[in-house]
A protein has these predicted regions:
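A cross-kingdom feature that marks ATP-driven nucleic-acid transaction machinery
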Residues: 1-127
């Protein structure tokens, strides 16, 4: 995963829109790629979760204490909507204590979900 390669593959107009901060662009793939790149740089193996019953999670990582951490990356104002995250956290067989949503937000905690700005992906360390 490389954000530079990803944005380099965009059409010229799309690349200019990204650089100009055009709010009509879906930044989801860029945010997801940036978060994945940052987590990988900090020593995490990255996993993806998809279940017809529970939904899709962008990333799963395992911390040094062997806890599985589900991560959703959001790019829009609806970052507090995360059905799959809620489903996985509530699943009795998974025993997950907390999930993380990285998006266009401030640091906050609501229930068992921690919201972080995308730039804080570098705060996860696995060394």
């Amino acid at each position: 995963n490389d954000v530079g390669l990803l944005t380099g593959s965009f059409l010229k107009k799309t690349a200019l829109d990204v650089l100009d901060g055009n709010p009509d662009i879906n930044y989801g793939s860029i945010y997801e790629n940036a978060v994945a790149q940052e987590l990988r740089a900090h020593g995490f193996d990255l996993y993806y979760y998809n279940s017809k019953k529970l939904g899709e999670l962008d990333l799963l990582i395992q911390d040094r204490n062997d806890h599985v951490l589900p991560i959703e990356v959001k790019s829009g104002k609806s970052y507090k909507r995360h059905r799959a995250m809620d489903n996985v956290l509530a699943h009795p067989e998974y025993h997950l204590n907390t999930g993380y949503v990285l998006g266009p937000c401030n640091v906050s905690v609501e229930g068992n979900v921690t919201y972080l700005p995308v730039y804080m992906a570098g705060m996860f360390h696995n060394e």
